[in-house]
Each structure stands twice: as structure tokens, then as C-alpha cells.
């Protein structure tokens, strides 16, 4: 076990109520000493004599849910002043941790002969070991067990029976006990009757195992009594070939078997949770032609219960919080449990510059995962963003994938899911309310103590009475400059009429009006924080660092200054946990975080990726998606997400379509769902347009190769595409430097349609690579922007407009100049002009403004007319 995990130790808990019984205390001390001697981490959990049944049961549940504990024994009797149902308490112990073997499940398995799939009670197990040590074969022998207790007699009978002895159980109602004993080749007693079995009863040469513990008066002893067994030892030893003394016979073996069961439990735990060892079943698709709508397909498939899927992929029951039958949240503690395990292969799916309809990155992500898992027998996880309600109800639609490559249930995925976006909306708007409330009260109320930290203001004093008037003002008032406020209210709906609003119109606000706006929720910095955080504490720190405005003296104002970061953390405490769902074919999917890819970094959460990489094991794959084209989502994935996660991808999958390449090759702009008139070129073969449009594909392959990662091009095939068009794209992609290029039909065929893509990805993951970032984080802000513009977009240069130059100076002065860059620009072109397709050249990229997402950890320059509220 140490070889698999040097930090691993079997864990044992002994639960005792009261602790006033000397005999129980003695037994426990012996067990704890033995555990310590062999390296078991043993804990004595002592509950007070006043403990109620529910308190005892809750303690047991806590131990059941502790993955570092592999054995739990409940010391009997339960010495409580309250009425306790011992049977109920005993059966509350998880069967896989019941190293005493006393639960009904373990007893039942023993009775049925499932000796290899249960824990055998320690005393009978020790007795069997003693019998084996004599050299006598149990098979065919006559055995007599006196007593039928659940601890000794009943399990001893079962154990002897399934070792092929002919067994008789004797008890208080047995007639002519002496005659029955006289037939026994093997005699085991456990009745609690001092020296009841006489030597003359015993068959000559028999094996006698005495499990009785009885106290009888003895004036020669200091305490006036001595311990004897159920057998009269002096006379019995003359008849028996082997006999155990009392004390010192069975007792040490009982302790030894307890240690053995604990180690066995730990071994079973390691085997069951071996890295990458999944016991997963996949769902066979019933493909229909023509392919039905996404919602029809989704509803036609019955998903596995999500708790079953969680168990199949190695999650423990207490690590999973169920939200109904088809979705669940996964506890962050999973990362700690799996910390020593090696990560799997990391794949990011991106695309060429898309049409407004999208080119199928999500569909390809799910199709690839289904191919790798259900068809190529690899452990694989999809990690995708949670979609915003705005685009879901817009032209782009949902983000669950499509056809026979989607996440199900589709409605759950695309709408509320587990409420993460609603939590972000509440948290974001709490900050907005706090900003306006603070400005209102500072302008209408007398001086009060505030929350700004002394050290931040350069006030090196701790005694308030020594503050000067200036220092008091600086400490008590944030003095927010209304013109500097960058924090906006949000909602998860595309509502163009909220792009500019006026707040404070009520008479109660005493004329404190200002213009503001509503952004879409996924544009909130809190969403970016959620996606980039690595722990609850890290999220708390990031939320506290979010800059919402600047004071009139130029000091950045944070949520910490507003006194709301604690409340934000509480609002986000559940949202930080990744959401578990599944594909149509039964593969696991993490759906977590959904920052926009144009104004934020456009990637799902770091936490989801990290948990998934541990769960799949070193030979498995995690496939995640970067929003929009490679120039947007992929660049930010590498330069922002990978910087903060420390993860390095093995493969880039670049999705292309014939439709988009024809548009980039000079075809009409795709703007709607209907293809008529001059858009018929998208329906019929046109190799010339495809070849010209591959300039965009070539540029995006080049962009991916800037980071030193192999690129596999996935051509998402539509039924209107010709074979010649698909092969031409694959040929040109390889010539552009792609590791491989493969046509895919996963939309129509599910995972089977992406098998060749899966094989290509597996090969690429084994290819040598040398990952590197595009720019040094310590470069000046302008230089970092210029590098992205020139190397990724193909711009000649950048132009900083006055507002942008002011922000560069301000953020550099405030200490934010070393943050990575998150360009906010249109996703419909490599340039800032959405109408320019293909590979635009000869342009200067205008930077009209720059904003800071200090909590998330990046600066985002605003390019062109990019909006933060949907159309």
C-alpha cells in the first residue's frame, strides 16, 4: 500500500459510549496498542454517557464518510443513560468499514458462503486460524459450536460449515449436551457459563477452542476474582489434542484478526479507488434517420441515475450532492483525496473563426468524449461551460452539443442547472447595491467609522484617538468617484434596452442619480473568478480583490472596502462545486462556470478540470472547450487559464466546417438559419471557396502552434458537404502543420462518428511537445496587447485611444500592470471588424478602453464596439 501511496495509512476508529466500563477500556487499549505497532492510524472516539441514539448515529455517519478511515468498530455495550437500539447502531456502520463483521449485510454474506466478499467477525476468524495452525483439515470433521450469539456462535457455525465441516449448534435448549460434545472433532464454546463443559465430555484428540470469558470468586487474587472459560481447563486438557487457555488464548487472536480486517479493508479501498480504475457502463444509441431534433433525441434517451455514474467513475458517496436524479455537485475535497494520483491527458477543443451559428465545438467535444470512452475504452471526462440563458434563447441556441453528441437532459443543462448563474447574479447585484448605498450614505450622513484598512492608506497607527482629521476622513470614507465605477448590475437575459439606464430616480435617493447599465450575468467578474479559482479560500481572496471603482484620490476601491466579500463567498459557496452530468452515451461531464469568451476568458472552471484529470487516471483523457475561435478562447485558455491552473494541455483539437470556410473564402456572410438565394453556395460543392477559406484555418493552426502543442483538425461534417470538400480541408490542414485532420460525423452518428478523431487525438497526445506562453507576464501592458494583436490577429499594430491610454497609466500605477491580457473583441473576425472574413491584413487594432478584473486576475482591453449585453 505504501508503494502505491507513500502517505497512505490504514485508518481505524473505535467508537465508545461513556468509557466507565473497565473491561471495555481494557479491550480498547489493547486494540489501539496493536494498531499502533503495525502502523494503523487508530482513533478512540469517546461519546459521553448522555449521548442520544441520534448523536451516536451521526458520529457513525461522519466516520462512514471519512475516506481516511477504513475500519469502524462500535464497542459494546453502549453505556448510555438513554435508550439505544443496539441493532440499529450496529447496522449503521458502512458494511465496507464493518471490520467487526457484525452488520446484517456482512452476516448475511457469511451465512451464504460469500467469504471473500465480507468481513468475518474477529473472534470466529481467530478461532479458524487457530484450528488451521493445528494442521487438522476441517473438511469432513464433526464440529460442535456451543452458543448462538451474533458475535461468536452464529458466525462460527457459518464459518465451519463453509469450510466443509459437519456442524451442530448447541444451546440452552439442547438435550444431552454432553453426548453432543462427545461427538465433536472440533469444539468451540461461547456461552458465558464458567467451566460448564467438563473434561470427560470431550472426545479424545479433539480440538477445543474456548471463547468464554467468565469471572469467578478467588480469594488468592488481589481483586478477589479470576477469569475462566466455558471449559474446565484442567480436566479438558487431558482429553484434547489442542486447547486454548482462558485468558490468553482466543483474545490475542481476536485482536490480530481485527488488525487483519482493517488492513484488508484498506486494501479493498485502494483497489476500488485505484487511479483510472472505472467500472463504467455505456448507453447504446438508437440512431434514427433523418436525425431528429436535439430535444427529441435528448428526451428519447434514459440517463443513468447520476449517483450510479458517480460511483462508476470513482467518486465516493459523500463527495456527491444530488440535485435530483440527473445532476449533482461534486465536493472540492475530492481533489485532496486524489492529490497523489497522476493526471490524465488534457485536450482543449477550439475552432476556426466561426459564423454566428457556431461550428460545433461543443458537439465535437461531446462526440470526441463519447468516441474515446464508449468506443475506444478510455476513461474520459468532458469539461464544458454552463450556457447563459441569453444566447440559449437567441439565434445561437444552447450549448449542450447537438444531434447524437450532447449532454442530457438538455433542458436541465441549458437552463437553471443547479442555480450557479443565479448565485452569481445575486452576488454581483449585491456589490452594485453596496456601491450606490455607500455613496449615498457618505454624501448624506455624518462621519462614521468605515472598513478600509489602515495599511492600505499608509496610516501606521493603531490607536484611533491619535488619527489626524485627514486620516479620519481617509479611513472612514471611501469617497468613490461616480465616473470611475466599472461595476454594473447583471441579469441572465439578452435585454438590449438595459444597455444604458439611469439609477437613483426615486425621491428617496435625494437626487443621487447616475447612468449605469445591465450586463449579462456571464459577463460578471464573479463568473470569471469562479472559473479561475482553485479553492474556497482562493475564491474568497479573489472576490475580496475585485476592484469596482476608484476614489477621487486615485485609490482603487475593492469589495473588501465595501465590506461585502464575506457575503459574496457565502452566496457562492455552492456554486464553486462542479456540476456532474452525462452524455447521451453515458460518459461523465462536468458543467461548471460560463464566462463569456469575448469579454472574459471563455473557459470552464479550473476546479472541474483538476478533479476530472485525477479521476480519469494517467491513461485517461479530459476534453475541455475554449469559446469562439482559437484567436479568442484558445489564446485566453493558454495565457490566462493555464497560467493560473498550472496545467499544460497535450493536444489542441481545432474544429472547422465547410460552411464557415466557404464564408471565409469569399462566400456570403452567414447571418441566419435559412440558406437561400446567394447562400446556396453553402449547399453545393465549391472547392474554390473552400480552398480560399482555408486561409483562416491555416492561421488558426498557426495560432495554436505558437504555444507548442500538437493540433488535430476536426472537420465537422454536414450532410450537404461533399467528400471532395472534406478531403481538401484535411489535406490543406496537414500542409498547414496540423498533426492530423479528420472528418467527423458525430452529430449524426454519436461517438462512432468521431472514432477516427479519437484515434488521432490519442496519437497526438503521445507526440513530443514543448508548451510555452505567448508573452512574458512582466512585460508592459501595451507590449502584451501588441504581441496578441500581431501574432494572433495578424494586425500591423495597435492604437490606444485616450481612455485606454489613461487606463494603462492608472492600472500600472495601481500595481496591476503584471496581469495577463484578456482581449474583448468580436469573435466573428480575426480583426476588430466583424465584416472582415478570412485573414484580414493591413489593419491597426483600436483599443478604445481597458478594464481591470483584478479579482479574476486579468486586464481586458475593449476592442471596437464589443458589448457586454446581448443583442
Predicted regions span which residues?
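N-terminal ligand-binding/catalytic initiation module
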Residues: 1-78
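Conserved hydrophobic helix-helix packing surfaces used for dimerization/oligomerization
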Residues: 12, 138, 142-143, 347, ...
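Glycine-rich phosphate/diphosphate-binding loop of Rossmann-like nucleotide-binding domains
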Residues: 17-37, 49, 113-211, 216-234
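A short, aliphatic-rich alpha-helical micro-motif
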Residues: 66, 181-182, 203, 341-342, ...
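Anion-binding alpha/beta catalytic cores of soluble intermediary-metabolism enzymes, centered on
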Residues: 70-142
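Short glycine-/small-residue-rich Rossmann-like dinucleotide-binding loops
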Residues: 77, 190-193, 212-213, 627, ...
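Rossmann-fold NAD(P)-binding glycine/threonine-rich loop
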Residues: 83-111, 211-269, 389
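Flexible phosphate-sensing "switch/lid" loops adjacent to ATP/NTP-binding sites
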Residues: 276-871
